[in-house]
Amino acid sequence: MILTTTPNIEGKPVLEYLGIVTGEAIMGANIVRDFFAAVTDIVGGRSGAYEQKLSHARQIALNEMAEEARRLGANAVVGIDIDYEVVRDGMLMVTASGTAVKI
């Protein structure tokens, strides 16, 4: 399965557009991790705990989207957009969407 943010794949014409596909992941926050992330932010540096959480949520959303595309008979997803949003109570939502295609 080819996944790309571009609207097409160079050298590979789209044979069929199969529709919009999406994937979502909602991850909860951890109070202890939040505390240490805040300390990291105060003293400078990167928050590894949050980076791991974001990476994991993004991968879940992309995997769900790719699986939906496979069910439609696609072998690629083009025009992928990934969005991040904090929802109530510190929950993090990551969504991935794109167009399932046959190339």
Swiss-Prot record:
Pfam families in the record: YbjQ_1 (PF01906)
InterPro entries: UPF0145_dom_sf (IPR035439), UPF0145_YbjQ-like (IPR002765)
PANTHER family: UPF0145 PROTEIN YBJQ
Entry similarity comment: Belongs to the UPF0145 family.
Name this protein carries in UniProt: UPF0145 protein PTH_2690
Lineage per the UniProt record: Bacteria, Bacillati, Bacillota, Clostridia, Eubacteriales
